[in-house]
Amino acid sequence: MKGVLFIVASLVAFATGQDCPAYYVRSQSGQSCYRYFNMRVPYRMASEFCEMVTPCGNGPAKMGALASVSSPQENMEIYQLVAGFSQDNQMENEVWLGWNSMSPFFWEDGTPAYPNGFAAFSSSGMAPPRPGAPPSRAWPVNPQNPMSGPPGRAPVMKRQNPPVRPGQGGRQIPQGVGPQWEAVEVTAMRAFVCEVPAGRNVPIGQQPGMGQGFGNQQPGFGNQPGMGGRQPGFGNQPGMGGRQPGFGNQPGMGGRQPGFGNQPGVGGRQPGFGNQPGMGGRQPGFGNQPGVGGRQPGFGNQPGMGGQQPGVGGRQPGFGNQPGMGGNQPGMGGQQPGMGGRQPGVGGRQPGMGGQQPGMGGRQPGMGGQQPNNPNNPNNPNNPNNPNNPNPRFNRPRMLQEADALA
C-alpha cells in the first residue's frame, strides 16, 4: 500500500506551472491548496503520504501535511470540499485531520494548536445558521476535548447528524450546518485531506528555479546559476560557457580553468581534455603532450598516433618507426627486425621470414633460399639435372648416355 501511495504522491506533486499541484484546489484565503483522497488508511500512513507532496511555483519551501484547520472558514471549506464528492453533496466519509494526541500542541504542519485543545472559534466566522435555528454557538466540535482523551488518538472530520425532519429522512444536512470532529484511534482506517502551501504564479525567468530560468539572474537554471549564467550551476559561475568551475569557462567547455574548459577542457590549455592535457592540447593526456597528434608520450607524437616517437607510425620503439608499423626500426613493417623490415623478422632482409638472409624465403641458407639444400638450385650437386652430379642414381643426363650406349 505504501508503494502505491508513493507513486500517487509523485504524480499529484507534478508542478504544471500553476500555484497548486495537479488536482489540488486553492483555498479561498489563497494560502493553501487542498486535495481529498478517498483512500481508507491509518493515520500515520495518511500523514506520510501528504508529507511527500511538494509545493508549486514560488511558494514556501515546505512540504505537504494532513490538513490543519486554523479558522471556522477553513473548517467549512474543507468540509465542503469533501462533501462535493458525495452523491447528495454531503460528507459521506470521515477524514483525518493533521493533529494527534501524541503531539497535542502542534498541527502536523508545525503551526501551534489552540492552548486549550480544539476549543470553539468565535461565531463571527461561522456560516450563517440554518433557518429557524438560534445563532451558532461557534465551531461545531464535539464537546469532548481531544487533548483530555487517551493517547494514540487523532481527530476526524465528519458530518453532523441533524434531527430527522419531515421529508429529509435524516439524510440531508441543512445548509449552513458544518461538520463535527471526533477523536478516534490512529489505527482506524479513514480517508484524508492533504494540504500544501500555495505558490505564486511568477513569469518564467524572474524568480529562482527553472525560469528564473534560462539566461536569468537568480539561482537555478538561470544566470545565478543557470545556463549562460554568472554563478555556480549550469551558468557562467559555473556553467556552460561560464567563467568559473563547472561546465563553464572556469571550468567548462571552452573555459579557462580545470574541467571541460580551457583549463582544462576541450581545446583548453591545462590538464584535462584541453591543451594541458586534452584533445589537441600541449601536455600529457589526450592532447599534444601526450594526445592525438601530440608531441609527448601517450597517443601523441611522443609517443602517439602519427607522432615522432614510440607509437603508431612513430620513430621510436612501440608501434611506430622505432619500432612500429611502417617504422624505421624493428617492428611491423619497419626497416629493422620485424614484420616486413630490413633486418631479421618477417619479410625482412636479414634472417627471418621472407628476408634476404637466412630464414623463410630468404636468399641465404634456410627454407626457400638459393643456397645449399635447395633442389632447384642448378649448382646444387644433388640436383638430378646437374651433369656434374657424381651420384648416377640422380644424374639424369649420365643415365641417358649410358642407356644409349647399351642400345
Swiss-Prot record:
Name this protein carries in UniProt: 41 kDa spicule matrix protein
Residue ranges of every copy of the C-type lectin domain listed in the record: 29-160
Renumbered residue ranges of the record's region Disordered: 143-176, 204-407
PROSITE patterns named in the record: C_TYPE_LECTIN_2
Family classification: Belongs to the SM50 family.
The UniProt record lists the keyword Transmembrane: no
General function of this protein: Major matrix protein of the sea urchin embryo spicule which directs crystal growth in certain orientations and inhibit growth in others.
Comment block on domains: The repetitive domain may provide a calcite binding matrix.
Compositionally biased region (Low complexity): 370-398
Keywords attached to this entry: Repeat, Secreted, Signal
Annotated compartments: Secreted
Biased composition (Gly residues): 223-369
InterPro entries for this protein: C-type_lectin-like, C-type_lectin-like/link_sf, CTDL_fold, Pericardin-like_rpt, SM50_spicule_matrix
GO CC entries: extracellular region
Tissue: Expressed specifically in the micromere/primary mesenchyme cells (PMC) lineage.
Signal peptide: 1-17
